[in-house]
UniProtKB/Swiss-Prot annotation:
Annotated site (Plays an important role in substrate specificity): H227
GO CC annotations, alphabetized: cytosol
Disulfide bonds listed in the record: none
UniProt cross-references to PANTHER family, sorted A to Z: SERINE HYDROXYMETHYLTRANSFERASE, SERINE HYDROXYMETHYLTRANSFERASE 1
Protein's name in the database: Serine hydroxymethyltransferase
Family as reported in the entry's similarity comment: Belongs to the SHMT family.
Catalytic activity: (6R)-5,10-methylene-5,6,7,8-tetrahydrofolate + glycine + H2O = (6S)-5,6,7,8-tetrahydrofolate + L-serine
GO BP annotation list: glycine biosynthetic process from serine; tetrahydrofolate interconversion
Amino acid sequence: MDFTNLKNTDPELLDMIKKEEERQEYNIELIASENFTSLSVMEAMGSLLTNKYAEGYPHKRYYGGCEFVDEVEDLARERLKKLFAAEHANVQPHSGSQANMAVYMSVLQTGDTILGMDLSHGGHLTHGSPVNFSGKLYNFISYGVDKETETIDYDQLKKIALENRPKMIVSGASAYPRIIDFEKIREICDEIDAYMMVDMAHIAGLVATGLHPSPVPYADFVTTTTHKTLRGPRGGAILCKEKYAKAVDKAIFPGIQGGPLMHTIAAKAVCFREALREDYKEYMQQVVKNTKVLGEELKNYGFRLISGGTDNHLLLIDLTNKNITGKDAEKLLDSVGITVNKNTIPFETLSPFITSGIRIGTPAVTTRGFKEEEMKKIAYFMNYSIEHREENLSQIKEQIKEICKKYPLYQNA
């Protein structure tokens, strides 16, 4: 990208950006929630739309001069509705967390009971963690996975729901590698007359391309981020049934946000258009193929995969049998140029700052053009680095750099 002005006005900051650019260019990015946006997304994000205040919604603003940003937001909303066949869309949430907060506030009261997935079983902070606003403002209770299969225990979920009769059931996850049965959860919600909310932030790209069943026909509310598998700017969005549209919109503004970030909404519109194209479907199909191959190769090296494998874009790995913690594995792999994140596993015995596992995903490397053969090499690099962690691993780091050179991030930037 062109940094001519920044070079003159703030070379100190530009130096930091350049170092991060180099890190992204020469490292294998396996954090499941990260991706590389297109240059078009970045151009929209860096446009002069950032100058415009636009409190309110299209054609009902609290500021003048909004006729063109109204067009931008309308375009983003219509594209998002088309992408997921939804009745209503709100593209103003600054993040997935704020999208979740807005849904809770739209139909619930402080202190109401909500049933969500346990964080250590694959849920998310905003699904009831006691350190998060969700756990502080609402009475969250948790469901999790079966100890044997390590997949969602729907019988347990139903039992807890019948015993506690929550006002809402939240599904979706940040570290769950299997298909989620939204139809079954809808049936449980109907039995206790509860709202159904799905946080599909991680799997939105899979849902958009038919590689994961859509929650939209079943859920009252669906939230998502626009980065991760959707490959857009950092931000959030909400889909809902038309009957909840006013409540959701009011919860975002004036409920928890002021002016929307119009440059980000423009970038969201770009990514929704990209996700409607046929080549995006091919990309997501390759993501799933890559994840499955990477998982099988790691299993061949003796790594234990939570639930035994994956149906989506990510793998959760229990490192106990490798005699290394998630924290140490993250640091070790980072030293050779593979970026992962430490992650708790179901029935975790270690602190969330240490963890027994790591979470990895393939959306970012697939965006670069990596395919099955590269997945086999990544599995080899990971295994070799962990098995030979007391040795000099400079040759592995060099091999990783060479692979990255074959798949440059932004060839024409």
